[in-house]
Amino acid sequence: MAWALKLPLADEVIESGLVQDFDASLSGIGQELGAGAYSMSDVLALPIFKQEESSLPPENENKILPFQYVLCAATSPAVKLHDETLTYLNQGQSYEIRMLDNRKIGELPEINGKLVKSIFRVVFHDRRLQYTEHQQLEGWRWNRPGDRILDIDIPMSVGIIDPRANPTQLNTVEFLWDPSKRTSVFIQVHCISTEFTMRKHGGEKGVPFRVQIDTFKENENGEYTEHLHSASCQIKVFKPKGADRKQKTDREKMEKRTPHEKEKYQPSYETTILTECSPWPEITYVNNAPSPGFNSSHSSFSIGEGNGSPNHQPEPPPPIADNLLPTSTPQEAQQWLHRNRFSTFSRLFRNFSGADLLKLTREDVIQICGPADGIRLFNALKGRMVRPRLTIYVCQESQQLQELQQKHEDGDAVTSTFFVYHAIYLEELTAVELTEKLAQLFSISSQQISQIYKQGPTGIHVLISDEMIQNFQDESCFVLDTMKAETNDSYHIILK
């Protein structure tokens, strides 16, 4: 007797539906993705994932950053998926940047209850302009006397302490803040992007800038030099209300695009998150520079004597050449790259030791870094010095007379006398620079040199001027004669 198990009608319907769903789920295997389907590569290319990409080595990619900086201004919708976000700002308008503490419990306990220092900068985004940044900013200062590129709107800011703006650094501001308290700083950018374009005929595109923030903690000496975190974002600055018009124009252009074209662009975000970057190279090492205004003062007045009075300050040591050594570790090589303004390539060369970098040929570095940076890196690796604008050779007359007299007493021929000259290298070609170089040569203070003369025709004494030095022939030789001044303890020097 055959037994047959019959399912209820409802169970049969459920079983049939499950079979159809399973068949449908298998039917797409081996087929191409249609227009309505998606791939994981497209998902990973979305801006939310792209903005989280780190510019640091892989071992640091998964770490949570201690701080986060958020610029309260919308990003442009006309930026492609794989490009960095771009934010439009109005000239002179105050924009909030929120300083957020992202530390986990127990992270960086040494700054608990203490202040940190943040330095804000507006710098060029284009590498071409970075090379001439000093000249560009000096030109802006000349055209806009009394104005600054970057300012803090102090009345609107919250939680900032001791805000400062160096009068010589128009694009930099700094302040202290407590990470445990709410901190928001309002900044104003006063230059517009079109002020730095090469040709100004109207309608040209403005150059992009970067807002960079470097944060430091206090060291044992009370100086804020230990780097904690750096981040930056790309901006363009327009005349008042120009940023709003540009944002509206970009939005209207995107609305006219097809859905397929829109998928290639990032959506516009209400705020701009600054992404982590390398620290500004000059900041980390700024305190290694000697203090300005330090003058040596010795009482002796002969070349190479070097026995100054103990009551005066010793002569400052010569600057140490920052040459990369073959024995340098990869960590030391990274520090050397940052000090010499090659931070862009620090990740590329993160596993290179000093010997590895020094083995690179000129063609190697040009191929890796491009022509401009490649040549600069090659010259830095080889320690090539810039040729001075003017070189002169000097010898002290008293030494010559002593040697001539000694030769005469010994009965030797005068023509066999050997004189020692000292090289002086001039860059600025000014009388002040020559005075300082001669003071160093004689181991005295530059204030002890009253005047410098050049012996002219018929023995006349011509006062040295900037124009005269600029007309010196390169590698000219001079004999120095010194005379005591009648009024004080200074000296006159005569070039013969």
Curated annotation (Swiss-Prot):
Subcellular compartments: Nucleus
Chain intervals for the UniProt region annotation (DNA-binding): 133-386
Region ranges (Disordered): 238-268, 296-327
GO MF, one example: DNA-binding transcription activator activity, RNA polymerase II-specific
Domain Grh/CP2 DB positions: 61-300
Keyword entries, A-Z: DNA-binding, Nucleus, Transcription, Transcription regulation
Similarity-based family: Belongs to the grh/CP2 family. CP2 subfamily.
Function according to Swiss-Prot or TrEMBL: Binds the B-response element 5'-CAAGTCCAGGCAAGT-3' of the ENS1/ERNI promoter. May be the major transcription activator thus being essential for its expression.
Protein name: Transcription factor CP2
Organism: Gallus gallus (Chicken)
Biological classification of the source: Eukaryota, Metazoa, Chordata, Craniata, Vertebrata
Name of the gene: TFCP2
